[in-house]
A protein has these predicted regions:
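Short, amphipathic alpha-helix enriched in basic
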Residues: 2, 10-35, 39-45, 59-63
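Amphipathic alpha-helical packing segments from all-alpha helical-bundle domains
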Residues: 120-144, 155-167
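Hydrophobic alpha-helical connector segments
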Residues: 75-108, 115
């Protein structure tokens, strides 16, 4: 009697896992989709079902980081009752916990001698996701305000959130403190500062954040 061969379904997560392992083990990004698929026993049509190129796959990795972060946020039953400031804090804390779990890959892909434009292109979709997340927060806040003059600009706030993430990402990449405790402190101080700026009470937090940056040689 012939033995039935059970085929394992290839998913985007499995392809991403193969890709990240390849990068870490070989310390180089694969250049040929054909060779990559052959080495990992992936049918080319299965690869193209999810990704049109390696560049698209690289963007998808960052999208997964964001999606996994927001999924974890919404699993917390208390999350919806958080203030917008606490939602942003929780988002950054969770995001960087996930990045820490994949730190070797992130450091390699962003620290190699690739052109800056290539690195920014890799983060393009993530930038859109973070800005959309920030827009939702500020629109929730604006909905509770009756005077137009007290409402904040979603566009400005969302761009600020992206700049904040980019700063924290660089800080985290350079952080050598135990458990990346300095990154946690930077998250807390930067989120406090940006929300105080939008509440028009920025002076104390700006001074505090400036002292922190000076101490860490980032000023």
């Amino acid at each position: 009697m012939a033995t039935k061969v059970i085929s394992v379904k290839m998913t985007d997560d499995k392809i991403i896992a193969h890709y990240m392992n390849f990068v870490l083990e070989n310390e180089v990004h694969p250049k040929s989709i054909f060779k990559f698929c052959k080495e990992h026993k992936i049918k080319e049509d299965e690869f193209y079902k999810y990704f049109g190129s390696f560049e698209a796959l690289q963007k998808s990795i960052w999208n997964k980081f964001f999606l996994n972060t927001t999924t974890l946020l919404h699993k917390n039953k208390d999350y919806e009752n958080f203030s917008n400031k606490d939602k942003m804090l929780t988002f950054f804390y969770t995001m960087f916990e996930l990045l820490t779990m994949n730190r070797s890959y992130v450091l390699f892909t962003l620290s190699t001698n690739r052109k800056m434009l290539d690195k920014m292109a890799e983060l393009k979709d993530l930038r859109s996701h973070i800005k959309e997340f920030a827009i939702e927060l500020i629109e929730e806040s604006n909905a509770d305000k009756t005077l137009k003059i007290t409402k904040q600009s979603p566009r400005v706030f969302s761009e600020g959130a992206w700049v904040q993430f980019a700063f924290l990402l660089k800080f985290w990449m350079d952080d050598s403190s135990a458990g990346f405790e300095k990154t946690d402190l930077a998250i807390e101080k930067s989120v406090t500062t940006i929300f105080d700026v939008f509440d028009n009470t920025p002076l104390d937090s700006l001074i505090d954040f400036g002292k922190f940056l000076y101490k860490e040689n980032f000023a």
